[in-house]
Amino acid sequence: MARYVTTVRTAKTPKEAFAYMADLRNFAEWDPGVKAVRQVEGSGGGPDSVFDVTVAGIGRDLTLRYETEEYDAPRNLLVVARSTVFTSIDRITVEPDGTGSVVTYDADLRLNGVLRVGDLGLRLMFGQIGDRAAAGLRRVLGAQVA
């Protein structure tokens, strides 16, 4: 299992930050590993939203179908994608902070079945991928110094 957690303090209100993060089509704006996002069901972020997220893979691109499993605006979002290779569990929480908010992105990537033997390599690679995504998230949310 590989896990990456980042927290960003922003001037955006909880409602603004949550709306931006819940619409997974925005992932391509801040995560350099995301090549494209297509909404399959719903309209923007919402409890019934489903997105196909295409990521740069090793040797070829991989499209993951993210389904919204928890949607509690403007505080909590859980989206999950399952493939034959791995399962991705992404939780986004937004907390009020003065006139702005604090956004926490918690990504958990798990190899499936016999592929779990590659967890150590996945952890190392996921840390680098997460660092690049976190930098992009700070940029788009207009991160403030804590």
Where are these regions (language model features)?
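Hydrophobic ligand-binding cavity/cleft-lining segments
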Residues: M1-E41, A146
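Well-ordered beta-strand positions in beta-sheet-rich domains
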Residues: V5-T7, T63-R65, I89-R91, D106
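A short, compositionally biased micro-patch
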Residues: A11, W30, Y71-D72, D97
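Generic helix-packing signal
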Residues: M21, D72, I92, L111, ...
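Glycine-rich portal/gate segments that line the openings of hydrophobic small-molecule binding cavities
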Residues: R38-F86, G98, V102, R132-A146
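Beta-strand/loop substructures that line and gate deep hydrophobic ligand-binding cavities in soluble
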Residues: V80-R132
